[in-house]
Curated annotation (Swiss-Prot):
This is Connector enhancer of kinase suppressor of ras 2. The keyword Cell cycle does not apply. The gene is Cnksr2. Residues 324-349, 480-509, 538-558, 682-766, 864-900 are annotated as: Disordered. Belongs to the CNKSR family. One of its GO terms (cellular component) is cytoplasm. Residues 683-693, 875-888 have a biased composition (Acidic residues). Transmembrane segments: none annotated. The lineage of its organism: Eukaryota, Metazoa, Chordata, Craniata, Vertebrata. The keyword Phosphoprotein applies. CDD domains: PDZ_CNK1_2_3-like (cd06748), PH_CNK_mammalian-like (cd01260), SAM_CNK1_2_3-suppressor (cd09511). It comes from Mus musculus (Mouse). Keywords: Coiled coil, Cytoplasm, Membrane, Phosphoprotein. Its main location: cytoplasm. It is a peripheral membrane protein.
Length: 1032
C-alpha cells in the first residue's frame, strides 16, 4: 500500500483537514478545531469519545459519525493486506462465541438475576453491537461481486442478514433477561455454524485471497461523455462501483469492474465521504481523473483479466435496485444502456445499478452479427442489438483474444444459455466455437487455474448438484468420447476396438454427476433439454473415474486381498499384532495373531510373512484410529467406522502400539481426502473363513481351508530363513491355540520358539477334495499328509469303527476321543512335534501306528470319556484370557527348546500319549498345564442339555469354591483366642458384605426372631465396641 498511497498513520494535519472536508455537512463546523489542534493521521486513528469532546464535538451523534469514518480508515490502514473472507468469518465467529461465553459466565455467577430482571446490562448490549459490527464487515464482502453472483455465498449473505435482524429484534423485546439470553444463544450458535461453513471452503481461492489497491488513470474525457461509472455508496461511507457504461472511459480502460471500491480520487482519500462530495471530486478535473481502487479477489488467473470482470449490471443472485428520483447532486449519465426487457427503457442515474437484460450475452463477430444460425432461430421474435448497442459488446473482441490464453486441457466454467434446444441443434458444427457460451462468475469450490486439478475438487465434482462444462474443440471431444467408451468396456471385462473419429461429434459435453444423467439422456435421445440453467464440466480424468465407478459391479469381486505379502513389498510399518475376531459364541477364541503390513494408508494382515493372500485389509482414511480402552487386552487400539464396523488390534508392548498409532495417523492424514474410496465394499475386506468360528453353527462339519497349519519335519522347519525380527515369541499360528472351531489349527513348534511358520508351496498343500479321493490305508483312514506323497509314512493298524474314522478325518468331533486319550502316534519324524507337552488339543488327522493302542482306546473305562472330566477343577482360579494365552505360549516355547527325538516301542508311545492327553495309566483325567485348564473349560458337547448341565455344574463348583474361601475367612476370626473388639471391628469393616450375609442367613432360619435380630444387627453396626463383643 505504501507504493500506491501514503498510509493514514503518516498523514499530516493538513491531510486530515482535507479528508474531513468530505464528511457529512454537520461535521464541517469542527474542521477548524482539528486544524487548530493539529491532529495528525496517527492521532486520528486513535481518537476517542473523550478526545472528540475536548475538540468541541459534544453531540453523541456527531461523535459517532466521525468515529465510523475513522473506523473505515483504520480498516484501510491496518487490515488491507490481511483482510479476506476467511479472516472476516473468523472474526464474526469469535464475536459470536464471545457473546456466548459472556452469557454463560453471567449465569455461573452467584448474583445472576436474569430470571427476574428485564433490563439488559450495558456490557451485554456492547457485545451485541460488536457482533453486529463484525457481521457488517463480512456482509460488505458478500454483498458485492464476485461473491454476490455465486449462489452459495448469496444464500450465506441472506442468512447472516436474517440472523442480525433477528438479533436486533430480540434485544428490543420486552421479556426477562433469561429468555432474551436463550434466544441470543441460539442466534450465536447459528452464526457460528455459518462462519464454520465459510471457513470450511478453504479450497475456494475467493475465500483466502486478500484485497489489493490499484491505481487507474482516466484521460481524454469529453465533457458530454462523462466517466461512465455506476457507484453505490453505503450509509457508512464506502463507495462501490456496480457497473460501467459501454464505450465510456471507464469501459475502455478495461480495469474498472463491478465490486471495486473507490479509495482515492486524485490522490485524495474519499473513504467515509458523502456521495455528493465524491461526485464533485470526480468532476473536479475535466481533463481526467486518477482513481485508487480497492479490488477484491476475482479469480486465480493473474496473466489475464478474469472472465467475470466488466459486468454491467447487478448479478442475478441479487435483486436489482429500483432507481429513485435523483437528487440535486445526481448527474444524468452521458450515455444510456439499452436493455431489451419487457419494461420500457429509461435513462438510469449514475449512482444506481442498471437492471439486467432479459436475454443472456451473445458474442458477435467483427461485423456485429451472430456467429451461428442456430442462435438466430433461437432468438426469433426478440430484438437483436448490434455493435455498441449490445450491453456487453466490448466482450466480443476481448473474449476472442482471451480464449486462446487458456490451454487445451484447462477447465473453463461457462454459462449454458440455450434452452429447449434439441440434440440436433446442440451439436457442434465445424464453425468457430468461441462464441457459443458466455462465461460468468466462478461457482463456489472451483477456481480458474487450469494447470493443476486438485483431487479434492475432482472428488467434489461428482457430488455437486450443478456440474460444469469444459468447452473444447471438435477433435478433443471426439478423442475423449472414445476414451469414455473404451474405459467403460474395459471395466466390464470386454475388449473393444478403437472407432474412427468423426468430424461431427454426437455430443459436445458429458454430464458428470449422477443427478444430471437425465438431462444427458434427453440430449442424446433428441428430446428438448428442460429450461433450466446448468453448470457443466468435462474432465477426462473424472470421466474415466466415473466410468469405472459405474461399471464396478463387474469387477467388484476382485478383492484387494489377492496380493501376496511378498508382492506387497516393504510397508511403511509392519510387524505382529493381535486382532480381535467377531465373537460368534461365548466360548470362541477372541484374539488371533497376524502379520500386519501398513502400505499407502491401507492395513493388510496375513497369517505369516510368506502368505499368498491377505486375510483382510481396511482402508484407514475411512476409519477413525484411537486407543481401545474398552478392551481388556493390553495395548489395544481400534479402527472405527460409524456405518461399517469396528476393528480391534493389540500390540505386545506399549512402544509397539505407539509406533503403529503414529504411523497410521501420519499416513491417513495425507490420504484422508485424496484417496477416499467411493464404494463401501472397498472400505474393508476380510476372509470368509472366520464366519464358521463356532461349532454350534451349521458349518461345523465343513472342512477347514487348505492352509498350512500341519506339522512338518524338523529338517524343514529348522531350516526356515524366515525368523521374526523383533520378539523371540511364538508366531501367530503358534500362539493361537485351536478352540472349538474347526478352522483354527495349531502351528506346531519344531525348533526354537523364534521360528516363524512357513507358507507351504502348492505341491505340499493338499485340499480336502484330494484327501477324500485319497485311497484308504489298511486301517480305513485317510492319511492327511503334510509332505509329498513319497515322504509320507503309513502304518498297518487294525480297522476302527466308522465313527472313529470320521473323528480322525474331520476335526469337529475330535474332542470326544483324542482330547482324552491323546493323539495317535505319528511317524517317527513327526511324533515328537505333536507330543510337545503344551496342553493344547492334540491333532486328530494322523494315523495310529500300533494296533495295541487302538485296542486300549476302545476298551478304556467309560469314566474316561465322561464329559464331566472336561470341567475346570475348582482349585484353579479363572484368569484373564490374554494372560493365559501368553503363559501358555511361553510354556510351549520352553518345553520345545530342548526337545529330542527318541525312538521307542509301542508301550513307550502309549505312555507318552496318555501323558500328553492328561490321563493317568488307569484312565483318570489329570490336569497338567494352565492351557489345559482353559481348554477343558471351553470344551463343549453337541447335546445342549448336557451343555446346560455342565454349565450348571461349573456354577455350583465356582460357588462352592467361593463359599470355602468365606468359611476360611470366618474360621480365621473364630480360631483366634485373643480376638479383641478393635480387631473384630476392623475385620467386620473389611468383610462387611460377608458379615451381612451371615446375619441375613441366620435370621432367615428363624422367622419369629427376624425383627429382633435385625434390630440387634443394626445396633451392632452403630453402637460401641463393648456391645459388639456382647453380641458376638
Amino acid at each position: 500500500m505504501a507504493l500506491i498511497m501514503e498510509p493514514v498513520s503518516k498523514w499530516s494535519p493538513s491531510q486530515v483537514v482535507d479528508w474531513m472536508k468530505g464528511l457529512d455537512d454537520c461535521l464541517q463546523q469542527y474542521i477548524k478545531n482539528f486544524e487548530r489542534e493539529k491532529i495528525s493521521g496517527d492521532q486520528l486513528l486513535r481518537i476517542t469519545h473523550q478526545e472528540l469532546e475536548d475538540l468541541g464535538v459534544s453531540r453523541i451523534g456527531h461523535q459517532e459519525l466521525i468515529l465510523e469514518a475513522v473506523d473505515l480508515l483504520c480498516a484501510l490502514n491496518y487490515g488491507l493486506e490481511t483482510e479476506n473472507l476467511k479472516t472476516l468469518s473468523h472474526k464474526l465467529n469469535a464475536s459470536a462465541k464471545n457473546l456466548q461465553n459472556f452469557i454463560t459466565g453471567r449465569r455461573r455467577s452467584g448474583h445472576y438475576d436474569g430470571r427476574t430482571s428485564r433490563k439488559l446490562p450495558n456490557d451485554f448490549l456492547t457485545s451485541v453491537v460488536d457482533l453486529i459490527g463484525a457481521a457488517k464487515s463480512l456482509l460488505a464482502w458478500l454483498d458485492r461481486s464476485p461473491f454476490a453472483a455465486v449462489t452459495d455465498y448469496s444464500v450465506t449473505r441472506n442468512n447472516v442478514i436474517q440472523l442480525c435482524l433477528e438479533l436486533t429484534t430480540i434485544v428490543q423485546q420486552d421479556c426477562t433477561v433469561y429468555e432474551t439470553e436463550n434466544k441470543i444463544l441460539h442466534v450465536c450458535k447459528t452464526l457460528s455454524g455459518v462462519c464454520d461453513h465459510i471457513i470450511s471452503l478453504s479450497s475456494d481461492p475467493l475465500v483466502s485471497q486478500s484485497a489489493h489497491l490499484e491505481v487507474i488513470q482516466l484521460a481524454n474525457i469529453k465533457p458530454s461523455e462523462g466517466l461512465g461509472m455506476y457507484i453505490k455508496s453505503t450509509y457508512d461511507g464506502l463507495h462501490v462501483i456496480t457497473g460501467t457504461t459501454e464505450n465510456s472511459p471507464a469501459d475502455r480502460c478495461k480495469k474498472i469492474h463491478a465490486g471495486d471500491e473507490v479509495i482515492q480520487v486524485n490522490h485524495q482519500t474519499v473513504v467515509g465521504w458523502q456521495l455528493k462530495n465524491l461526485v464533485n471530486a470526480l468532476r473536479e478535473d475535466p481533463s481526467g481523473v486518477i482513481l485508487t481502487l480497492k479490488k477484491r479477489p476475482q479469480s486465480m488467473l493473474t496473466s489475464a483479466p478474469a472472465l467475470l470482470k466488466n459486468m454491467r449490471w447487478k448479478p442475478l443472485a441479487l435483486q436489482p435496485l429500483i432507481p429513485r428520483s435523483p437528487t440535486s447532486s445526481v448527474a444524468t449519465p452521458s450515455s444510456t444502456i439499452s436493455t431489451p426487457t419487457k419494461r420500457d427503457s429509461s435513462a438510469l442515474q449514475d449512482l444506481y445499478i442498471p437492471p439486467p437484460p432479459a436475454e443472456p450475452y451473445i458474442p458477435r463477430d467483427e461485423k456485429g452479427n451472430l456467429p451461428c444460425e442456430d442462435l438466430r432461430g433461437h432468438m426469433v421474435g426478440k430484438p437483436v442489438h448490434k455493435g455498441s448497442e449490445s450491453p456487453n459488446s466490448f466482450l466480443d473482441q476481448e473474449y476472442r483474444k482471451r480464449f486462446n490464453i487458456v490451454e487445451e486441457d484447462t477447465v473453463l466454467y461457462c454459462y449454458e444459455y440455450e434452452k429447449g434446444r434439441s440434440s440436433s441443434q446442440g451439436r457442434r458444427e465445424s464453425t468457430p466455437t468461441y462464441g457459443k457460451l458466455r462465461p460468468i462468475s466462478m461457482p463456489v469450490e472451483y477456481n480458474w487455474v487450469g494447470d493443476y486439478e486438485d483431487p479434492n475438487k475432482m472428488k467434489r465434482d461428482s457430488r455437486r448438484e450443478n456440474s460444469l462444462l469444459r468447452y473444447m474443440s471438435n477433435e478433443k471431444i471426439a478423442q475423449e468420447e472414445y476414451m469414455f467408451q473404451r474405459n467403460s468396456k474395459k471395466d466390464t471385462g470386454k475388449k473393444s476396438k478403437k472407432k474412427g473419429d468423426k468430424s461431427n461429434s454426437p455430443a459436445h459435453y458429458s454430464l458428470l454427476p449422477s443427478l444430471q444423467m437425465d438431462a444427458l439422456r434427453q440430449d442424446i435421445m433428441g428430446t428438448p433439454v428442460p429450461e433450466t440453467t446448468l453448470y457443466h464440466t468435462f474432465q477426462q480424468s473424472s470421466l474415466q473415474h466415473k466410468s469405472k465407478k459405474k461399471n464396478k459391479g463387474a469387477i467388484s469381486g476382485k478383492s484387494k486381498r489377492r496380493i501376496s505379502c511378498k508382492d506387497l513389498g516393504r510397508g511403511d510399518c509392519e510387524g505382529w499384532l493381535w486382532k480381535k475376531k467377531d465373537a460368534k459364541s461365548y466360548f470362541s477364541q477372541k484374539w488371533k495373531k497376524y502379520w500386519f503390513v501398513l502400505k499407502d494408508a491401507s492395513l493388510y494382515w496375513y497369517i505369516n510373512e510368506e502368505d499368498e493372500k491377505a486375510e483382510g485389509f481396511i482402508s484407514l482414511p475411512e476409519f477413525k484410529i484411537d486407543r481401545a480402552s474398552e478392551c481388556r487386552k493390553k495395548y489395544a487400539f481400534k479402527a472405527c467406522h460409524p456405518k461399517i464396523k469396528s476393528f480391534y488390534f493389540a500390540a505386545e508392548h506399549l512402544d509397539d502400539m505407539n509406533r503403529w498409532l503414529n504411523r497410521i495417523n501420519m499416513l491417513t492424514a495425507g490420504y484422508a481426502e485424496r484417496e477416499r474410496i467411493k464404494q463401501e465394499q472397498d472400505y474393508w475386506s476380510e476372509s470368509d473363513k472366520e464366519e464358521a468360528d463356532t461349532p454350534s453353527t451349521p458349518k461345523q462339519d465343513s472342512p477347514p481351508p487348505p492352509y498350512d497349519t500341519y506339522p512338518r519335519p524338523p529338517s524343514m522347519s529348522c531350516a526356515s530363513p524366515y525368523v521374526e525380527a523383533k520378539h523371540s515369541r511364538l508366531s501367530s499360528t503358534e500362539t493361537s491355540q485351536s478352540q472349538s472351531s474347526h478352522e483354527e489349527f495349531r502351528q506346531e513348534v519344531t525348533g526354537s520358539s523364534a521360528v516363524s511358520p512357513i507358507r507351504k508351496t502348492a505341491s505340499q498343500r493338499r485340499s480336502w477334495q484330494d484327501l477324500i479321493e485319497t485311497p484308504l490305508t489298511s486301517s480305513g483312514l485317510h492319511y492327511l499328509q503334510t509332505l509329498p506323497l513319497e515322504d509320507s509314512v503309513f502304518s498297518d493298524s487294525a480297522a476302527i469303527s466308522p465313527e472313529h474314522r470320521r473323528q480322525s478325518t474331520l476335526p469337529t468331533q475330535k474332542c470326544h476321543l483324542q482330547d482324552h486319550y491323546g493323539p495317535y502316534p505319528l511317524a517317527e519324524s513327526e511324533r515328537m512335534q505333536v507330543l510337545n507337552g503344551n496342553g493344547g488339543k492334540p491333532r486328530s488327522f494322523t494315523l495310529p501306528r500300533d494296533s495295541g493302542f487302538n485296542h486300549c482306546c476302545l476298551n478304556t473305562p467309560v469314566s474316561a470319556c465322561d464329559p464331566q472330566d472336561d470341567i475346570q477343577p475348582p482349585e484353579v482360579e479363572e484368569e484373564e484370557e490374554e494372560e493365559e494365552e501368553e503363559a501358555a505360549g511361553e510354556n510351549v516355547g520352553e518345553k520345545n527348546e530342548n526337545r529330542e527325538e527318541k525312538l521307542g516301542d509301542s508301550l513307550q508311545d502309549l505312555y507318552r500319549a496318555l501323558e500328553e492327553a492328561s490321563l493317568s495309566p488307569l484312565g483318570e483325567h489329570r490336569i497338567s498345564t494352565k492351557m489345559e485348564y482353559k481348554l477343558s473349560f471351553i470344551k463343549r458337547c453337541n447335546d445342549p442339555v448336557m451343555n446346560e448341565k455342565l454349565h450348571r455344574l461349573r456354577i455350583l463348583k465356582s460357588t462352592l469354591k467361593a463359599r470355602e474361601g468365606e468359611v476360611a475367612i470366618i474360621d480365621k476370626v473364630l480360631d483366634n483366642p485373643d480376638l479383641t473388639s478393635k480387631e473384630f471391628q476392623q475385620w467386620k469393616q473389611m468383610y462387611l458384605d460377608l458379615f451381612l450375609d451371615i446375619c441375613q442367613s441366620t435370621t432367615s432360619n428363624d422367622p419369629l426372631s427376624i425383627s429382633s435380630e435385625v434390630d440387634v444387627l443394626t445396633s451392632s453396626l452403630t453402637h460401641t465396641h463393648s456391645y459388639i463383643e456382647t453380641h458376638v
